[in-house]
Amino acid sequence: MKLIAIDLDGTLLNSKHQVSLENENALRQAQRDGIEVVVSTGRAHFDVMSIFEPLGIKTWVISANGAVIHDPEGRLYHHETIDKKRAYDILSWLESENYYYEVFTGSAIYTPQNGRELLDVELDRFRSANPEADLSVLKQAAEVQYSQSGFAYINSFQELFEADEPIDFYNILGFSFFKEKLEAGWKRYEHAEDLTLVSSAEHNFELSSRKASKGQALKRLAKQLNIPLEETAAVGDSLNDKSMLEAAGKGVAMGNAREDIKSIADAVTLTNDEHGVAHMMKHLL
């Protein structure tokens, strides 16, 4: 195996959003063995750097669900953007329907100033409708969103279209605790010919250019590095990893992955709290 593409949340990162020592050592060993380690995530590149710079590990990074590729030195290699008019229409709808949203750009993740309030209101509504429900899981899902670095806060999405410098729209995320709101997002965009629609967690949906996906980015990078796809592996847990697992020579699902991801994988490793990435590198490749 000459290249391994690795998802972050639910895969390389454990439930505490950390890279375990076992996984860290596995990455270093792979690099010593001459394997090209690639981080492939829905997160923004600068957010990935906040995790990897303290570790002193440099890799190629596929970010924003495949919309952006940076080389190990942090230089932009390739990007695919959402058409600005399309981005305006998407954000106008999300804001009018009171979604918590995130806009991934090259410089920041833009989110509403009242974003936490929007989710707090949803939590209160959810609690009222489901008094017996355990809200800790929902609160943890919200904390995953808040734990990212590089946030910039806006009063309205329209500020992004009034900026002095034009903004590249890489990825737009909608988030809700309510199934019907998530389904409304899927229904609205699932047949859009110019967009890729995926999800990286139970409570979100994410939109990027039709030319952007983790699978397409993996193919592009493998070609750039002159590595046959048969000599690549990919590991992930969520719907946004599906194209990557299908594109790679060997697709590996995490033990904590969705069942539909496990069903298309060539192998299943341990969970992200059991150092599943390290286990994969040692036993499954």
Curated annotation (Swiss-Prot):
Residues annotated to bind Mg(2+): 7, 9, 237-238
CDD domains xrefs: HAD_Pase
E.C. numbers: 3.1.3.-
Keywords associated with the record: Hydrolase, Magnesium, Metal-binding
Signal peptide: none
Catalytic residues as annotated in Swiss-Prot or TrEMBL: 7 (nucleophile)
Record's GO cellular component terms: cytosol
Alphabetized Pfam families for the sequence: Hydrolase_3
Cofactor: Mg(2+)
Chain residues that bind phosphate: 8, 41-42, 214, 240, 282-283
InterPro entries in alphabetical order: Cof, HAD-like_sf, HAD-SF_hydro_IIB, HAD_sf
Function according to Swiss-Prot or TrEMBL: Catalyzes the dephosphorylation of phosphorylated 5-6 carbon sugars and monophosphate nucleotides (NMP) in vitro. To a lesser extent, dephosphorylates flavin mononucleotide (FMN) in vitro.
Matching PANTHER family: 5-AMINO-6-(5-PHOSPHO-D-RIBITYLAMINO)URACIL PHOSPHATASE YCSE, PHOSPHOSERINE PHOSPHATASE
Family of the protein in this entry: Belongs to the HAD-like hydrolase superfamily. Cof family.
NCBIfam families the UniProt entry points to: Cof-subfamily (TIGR00099), HAD-SF-IIB (TIGR01484)
Name the UniProt record assigns to this protein: Phosphatase YwpJ
Provenance organism: Bacillus subtilis (strain 168)
